[in-house]
Structure formats: C-alpha cells, structure tokens
Amino acid sequence: MGKKKSDSASGGAIPEGDYEKGKKIFKQRCEQCHVVNSLQTKTGPTLNGVIGRQSGQVAGFDYSAANKNKGVVWDRQTLFEYLADPKKYIPGTKSYSFFQMVFAGLKKADERADLIKFIEVDAAKKPSAYAHHLP
C-alpha cells in the first residue's frame, strides 16, 4: 500500500506506483523512442530531468508547435493526465516534423502510476552522455 497523491482530474488519487512494474512498462512501451538515463534524443526527446521541466524544452529536439506552446510543467499530476491520452492532452502532439507519435496512452491508472514512479526515479539520476538503453 503506497501513498496516493491527489488526482484532481478524476477526483481520486494517483497511486504511488511500483518502480519495477514501471521499468517493465517503459521497456515495452517507451524505450523504442525515449531514454531516461541519457541526454541524447532518440525518435522522441530524452526524459532525463523531465520532472519540473516545461513541455517542448529539450535542446536539439524538433517538437511540434502544440507541444512547445502547451507550456505545461511536468510533474506527477501532469504526467498522469498526459499518459492517459497524449493526443487529447496536447492536441497536435502526434506530429513532430519527421514522425508520427504512435503511443495512444495507458488507460489503467495503476500502469500510469507505475510508469511515473520509474520515470521519477530514473529521470532524476545523473545522465550518462553515452547510455542508450536501460541497465
């Protein structure tokens, strides 16, 4: 039983999340486009340091205008909402000048919380400039 944080969008609470389950979700659903342990970008921007960062702000990544202009600061709450339906949260996210974002979201609250827990922990670590994959 983990702590829960407020989920004002649904009136419930965001589950604390499970790091190991989140790591598995990241490998299955996110790692093909994102890294957390490096400053390098892949098809998607690095998620290293994402907590507390404003959307559309990774240097060298070609964001859509919608993502640049959203102005959201990523935290547990905003990630929880975004991960449920990225295209609804930031309309226009799907098109970064050279690829189409295919991630449709995670509908289960527990899966979103697990993924956020993993991202919170690993994205806060000092990045390796040459790391490309999870350990």
Swiss-Prot record:
State the post-translational modifications. Answer: Binds 1 heme c group covalently per subunit.
Tell me the Gene3D superfamilies matching this sequence. Answer: Cytochrome c-like domain (1.10.760.10)
> In its UniProt record, which GO terms are filed under biological process?
mitochondrial electron transport, cytochrome c to oxygen; mitochondrial electron transport, ubiquinol to cytochrome c
Q: Name one GO cellular component term.
A: mitochondrial intermembrane space
| Superkingdom per UniProt | Eukaryota
Q: Which InterPro entries match?
A: Cyt_c-like_dom, Cyt_c-like_dom_sf, Cyt_c_1A/1B
Q: Name one GO molecular function term.
A: electron transfer activity
Q: Does the keyword Transport apply?
A: yes
- Family matches, as PROSITE patterns: CYTC
Q: Does the keyword Mitochondrion apply?
A: yes
Family per similarity comment: Belongs to the cytochrome c family.
State what this protein does.
Electron carrier protein. The oxidized form of the cytochrome c heme group can accept an electron from the heme group of the cytochrome c1 subunit of cytochrome reductase. Cytochrome c then transfers this electron to the cytochrome oxidase complex, the final protein carrier in the mitochondrial electron-transport chain.
Q: What is this protein called?
A: Probable cytochrome c 2.2
Taxonomic classification, please? Eukaryota, Metazoa, Ecdysozoa, Nematoda, Chromadorea
Tell me what gene encodes this: cyc-2.2
